[in-house]
Amino acid sequence: MAAYDLIQTDAELAHMTARLRDAGVKRLAIDVEGENNLHRYGIHVALIQLFDGARGYIVDPLSLRDTNSLKPLLENAPWELIWFDAGNDLLSFQHAMGIKPSPIVDLVVAARLLGKNGGLHDLTGEGGSARAKDRFQRANWLRRPLTAPLLDYAISDVLHLHELQDSLMAELEQKGLAEAFRVKNLQTQNAERVWDPYANYTRISGFKGLSREDRESARVLWYARELYGQAHDMPPGNVASKQEMRMIIDKGIRSADQIAAFLNENRSRNRVVPADLSRCFTEAEKQVPQA
């Protein structure tokens, strides 16, 4: 395991960025631990892991006074940001912080062009049990302090990206795919990533087969769930799962009080406050476009 510095203040971040710049670093491996409606509402950048080829850095964005201080590190940076599968991380930066990292090198784009369909650990040969990886990935990365095993896991994903980049770029050149990679990689970097949680109401099971009236009720229910989740900083799935929403629709339950009673019937945790849910339904009915 490579040594790493834990960056927890704006001053430490500025010092690290200046040190990397002064050292003439040209490539910086990067990965992000994020949260998307798992333990709290919405999209969050919880941790940023970096490796310059010799030393690792873990930046805690939750401890920064101003996340704009990340921009000299990530936006129009003087180094390539080496990622493996950057899409979700770029979405998180864009919507949680208003940051659009560049220039990036997304190694998953290179791997797919070469017909390599494995994940990062498959391509680097770095093993580990699937159960352990799943446990770490589902950990609450927003909780502080983070344990040493979590920090060690986090930094491990960036330690082999330089070597993987060298290998994949050489193979792209050999097979005449370097220009195709350049184009696709730039598309990945510059894509405008839209996150609109209100637009996903069609994910309710069997939505398209519902009657027009039930589709309208389902949409209001989805909006109200999102509003309640925002108000209580609660993942929408903990307010009402898609299965529960379909049951509410099928049972013809329409009033907020009845819906709250249905959701709370067998719950000891994540109980819904009827009055708050009622306010969310009132607001949802105003927001849902009329058919």
Regions found by a protein language model. Give the residues of each.
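Short, surface-exposed beta-edge/turn micro-motifs
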Residues: 25, 44-45, 78-79
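Active-site-proximal helix-loop-helix substrate-binding element of RNase H-like nuclease domains
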Residues: 6, 49, 54-69, 79-162, ...
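A short alpha/beta connector and helix-capping loop motif
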Residues: 38-54
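N-terminal accessory regions of nucleic-acid-interacting proteins
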Residues: 1-28, 32
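Catalytic-core regions built around general acid/base machinery
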Residues: 16-19, 68-78
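Short, solvent-exposed polar/charged micro-motifs at secondary-structure junctions
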Residues: 37-41, 114, 143-146, 248
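Short active-site-proximal "capping" loops at secondary-structure junctions
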Residues: 33-38, 64
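Accessory DNA-binding and partner-docking regions appended to nucleic-acid-acting proteins
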Residues: 148, 164, 168-291
